[in-house]
């Protein structure tokens, strides 16, 4: 005897969703939130390179130099460059023959 004959199968009208005719505001809010979440997730997956690249490089620009005299800007650049030059000593140069 087959297992399929032993399993009860639901009748046709039990397959439908029972919450369609419900006017509960909680159900409506959950549906709206679910749809918005799905839309945002799809947009995130489509444009994640643009979004995260902008966030990553947008935060690394450094302080604004607006309104700062050019001499002070140059001094700041030299300090930043000297800090980078000091860090270069920690790396090992490997020369290939």
Curated annotation (Swiss-Prot):
Residues 44-97 are intravirion. Glycans are attached at residue 20. Residues 61-84 are annotated as: Disordered. The record marks 41 as: Seems to be involved in pH gating. It comes from the Viruses. Residues 1-22 are virion surface. GO terms for biological process: protein complex oligomerization; symbiont genome entry into host cell via pore formation in plasma membrane; symbiont-mediated suppression of host autophagy. The modification Phosphoserine is found at residues 64, 82. The chain crosses the membrane at residues 23-43. One of its GO terms (molecular function) is monoatomic ion channel activity. One of its GO terms (cellular component) is host cell plasma membrane. A lipid is attached at residue 50 (S-palmitoyl cysteine). Keywords: Disulfide bond, Glycoprotein, Host cell membrane, Host membrane, Host-virus interaction, Hydrogen ion transport, Inhibition of host autophagy by virus, Ion channel, Ion transport, Lipoprotein, Membrane, Palmitate, Phosphoprotein, Signal-anchor, Transmembrane, Transmembrane helix, Transport, Viral ion channel, Virion. It is found in: Virion membrane; Host apical cell membrane. Homotetramer; composed of two disulfide-linked dimers held together by non-covalent interactions. May interact with matrix protein 1. Forms a proton-selective ion channel that is necessary for the efficient release of the viral genome during virus entry. After attaching to the cell surface, the virion enters the cell by endocytosis. Acidification of the endosome triggers M2 ion channel activity. Cytoplasmic tail plays an important role in virion assembly and morphogenesis. When the channel is activated, one or more imidazole moieties of His-37 probably become bi-protonated. Belongs to the influenza viruses matrix protein M2 family. This is Matrix protein 2. The gene is M.
């Amino acid at each position: 005897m087959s297992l399929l004959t032993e399993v009860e199968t639901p009748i046709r009208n039990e397959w439908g969703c029972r919450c369609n005719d419900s006017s509960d505001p909680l159900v409506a809010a959950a549906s709206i939130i679910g749809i918005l979440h799905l839309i945002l997730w799809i947009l995130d997956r489509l444009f994640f390179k643009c979004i995260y690249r902008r966030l990553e490089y947008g935060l690394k620009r450094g302080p604004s130099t607006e309104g700062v005299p050019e001499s002070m800007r140059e001094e700041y650049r030299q300090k930043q460059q000297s800090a980078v030059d000091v860090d270069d000593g920690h790396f090992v140069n490997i020369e290939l023959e």
